[in-house]
Amino acid sequence: MRLSDMNGKEIIDLKKGERMGILGQADLEIDENTGHIKAFLIPTLKWFGFKKNGTEVRVPWRNIKKIGSDMIIIDFNDFSD
């Protein structure tokens, strides 16, 4: 799967069923030595959709449980970082 294939997918919290954002608004953290994806960096949004400077949620790759056709399911309760 290419990164462009994941753009626009909704990010859903597995336990709460909450919508956390759209991946097109997120960044990836990549290990420079291996080239592997380490985490998604998802900006948190303020009222009216304006970004809050410097605020983001780091989602380790191991917490991505499923990438479907229109959403990505993440286990936010399983973070050990």
Q: What does each model-found stretch correspond to?
A:
Residues 1-81:
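Peripheral interaction segments used for macromolecular assembly
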